[in-house]
Swiss-Prot record:
Name the record gives this protein: Transcriptional repressor NrdR
Pfam family, one: ATP-cone
Organism: Corynebacterium kroppenstedtii (strain DSM 44385 / JCM 11950 / CIP 105744 / CCUG 35717)
Zinc finger (unnamed) stretch: 3-34
Family as reported in the entry's similarity comment: Belongs to the NrdR family.
Cofactors named for this entry: Zn(2+)
């Protein structure tokens, strides 16, 4: 780690803390040459591989925008959407890899959204699962009711 003051290549860690549910590590460092102190932030990368093969960084904001469309006209707060996005990210990171496919992201959204708002869940599921008929909706509603009664 190069010192931002004198560009010396060595520093020592004075303090280390995890933040943002353990996904980020903040380290307080001190240069071994000039004794200047600085902070580094280390964040693990979570990549999403899309259906067309393109890979991009996981974005909670993008996830929230997508779920917000399903919640349009519903009484779902921005804070609730942020918590949902955080829960989805925790679930995806718990899978252990640094790369997930977009299908995994959609699957991770379904259960927390079902708990948050039933109508928004059906809207999201209809797009995510590519419903093409009323039978698709009926089947999903039947499965939904079965899970709800458990």
């Amino acid at each position: 780690m190069f010192c931002p003051f004198c560009h010396h290549p060595q520093s020592r860690v004075i303090d280390s803390r995890t933040v943002e549910n353990g996904f980020v590590t903040r380290r307080r460092r001190q240069c071994t040459k000039c004794h200047g102190r600085f902070t580094t932030v280390e964040k693990s990368v979570l990549l999403v591989e899309k259906r067309n093969g393109v890979t991009e960084d996981f974005s909670k904001d993008k996830l929230i925008r997508g779920v917000r469309r399903a919640c349009q006209g519903r009484n779902v707060s921005d804070d609730a959407l942020k918590l949902l996005a955080q829960e989805v990210e925790i679930d995806l990171r718990a899978q252990g890899g640094s790369r997930v496919n977009s299908n995994d992201v959609g699957l991770a959204v379904l259960e927390p959204l079902r708990k948050l708002d039933e109508v928004a869940y059906m809207r999201f599921a209809s797009v995510y699962k590519s419903f093409s008929s009323m039978e698709d909706f009926e089947r999903e509603i039947t499965e939904f009711k079965a899970r709800r009664s458990q």
